[in-house]
Amino acid sequence: MARYTGPRGRRDRRAGVMLSSMRKNPLEKKPYPPGEHGRDRQRQTEYGLRLMEKQKARWYYGVSERQFRRAYEEAIRQPGVSGENLLRLMELRMDNVVYRMGFATSRPQARQLVVHGHFLLNGRKHNIPSATLKPGDVITVRDKSRRLQPIQEAVEQVVAVPAWLEADHENFTGRVLHTPSRDEIDAPVEEQLIIEFYSR
């Protein structure tokens, strides 16, 4: 499935929540879905609600349907609550961890930086953004990449790093401390509805 490259604000309006890392919230000006009939939003069916929750999670993490479905199948095989397992798998993706550590200003940018080989994983060059990391894994910005404008800007703008990660921005390195719990994940989705969508 092709990756979405259209207006992020339009998609945020469709979801009804801020999913992208845009500085301006498109919902403040137009708090209704895009399109001719956006203001006349009809009541959603239960199927529609579950579908939208799945789409919101996909859009939030910037993954294709195929990748998300594969993560769901892995999540239901793991012990514990399937919905929480799914969100953990999304959070532990290499591109998301790079973004969460503050080495990129958005997930799409983090994905591009990873693909172009600007990071080391445990001391080795790594360019697979979908790779699932684990506690103890160390991410380092390659020496020759540390002066790149996107990375410099991201490091200057970083506000806070989640408690399940640590990041040393002076030395351009970070580590996964532990697997995130649900209350350490700020994804604006109801994960149980996603599980219900796929298991229908």
Curated annotation (Swiss-Prot):
Region described as Disordered: spans on this chain: 1-43
Asked whether the UniProt record includes Ribosomal protein among its keywords, one would answer yes
Disulphide linkage map: none
Recall the GO molecular function terms of this protein's record. Answer: rRNA binding; structural constituent of ribosome
Recorded hits in InterPro entries, A to Z, give: Ribosomal_uS4, Ribosomal_uS4_bac-type, Ribosomal_uS4_N, S4_RNA-bd, S4_RNA-bd_sf
Its GO CC terms are:
small ribosomal subunit
Compositional bias (Basic and acidic residues) = 25-43
Keyword Glycoprotein assigned to the entry: answer is no
- Residue stretches making up the S4 RNA-binding domain: 92-158
Q: Kindly indicate where the leader peptide sits in this chain.
A: none
Tell me the keywords, alphabetical order: Ribonucleoprotein, Ribosomal protein, RNA-binding, rRNA-binding
Q: Which domain of life is it from?
A: Bacteria
Pfam family, any one = Ribosomal_S4
List, in alphabetical order, the GO biological process terms annotated in this UniProt record.
ribosomal small subunit biogenesis; translation
Summarize the protein's role.
One of the primary rRNA binding proteins, it binds directly to 16S rRNA where it nucleates assembly of the body of the 30S subunit. With S5 and S12 plays an important role in translational accuracy.
Question: What is the similarity comment for this entry?
Answer: Belongs to the universal ribosomal protein uS4 family.
Q: How does it assemble?
A: Part of the 30S ribosomal subunit. Contacts protein S5. The interaction surface between S4 and S5 is involved in control of translational fidelity.
PANTHER family xrefs: 30S 40S RIBOSOMAL PROTEIN, SMALL RIBOSOMAL SUBUNIT PROTEIN US4M
User: This chain belongs to which protein, by name?
Assistant: Small ribosomal subunit protein uS4
Q: Which gene encodes it?
A: rpsD
